[in-house]
Amino acid sequence: PVLQVVRDIHGDILTPDSRYIL
């Protein structure tokens, strides 16, 4: 499946799984 990749305010690449691991 294709994961939606977004960037937080620091420019870090976040995925649905990693966005909770800050």
UniProtKB/Swiss-Prot annotation:
Q: Which UniProt keywords apply?
A: Protease inhibitor, Thiol protease inhibitor, Vacuole
Q: Where in the cell is it found?
A: Vacuole
Main localization, broad class: other
Any one cellular-component term (Gene Ontology): vacuole
Task: Give TM regions.
Answer: none
One Gene Ontology term of the molecular function aspect = cysteine-type endopeptidase inhibitor activity
Disulfide-linked positions? none
Tissue note? Tubers.
Transport as a keyword? no
Cytoplasm as a keyword of this entry, yes or no, is no
Q: What function is annotated for this protein?
A: Inhibitor of papain (cysteine protease). Does not inhibit trypsin, chymotrypsin nor elastase (serine proteases). May protect the plant by inhibiting proteases of invading organisms.
Additional remarks: Does not accumulate in tubers infected with Phytophthora infestans. Has a single chain structure.
Give the record's family classification: Belongs to the protease inhibitor I3 (leguminous Kunitz-type inhibitor) family.
Report the protein name in the record.
Cysteine protease inhibitor 4
Q: Which organism is it from?
A: Solanum tuberosum
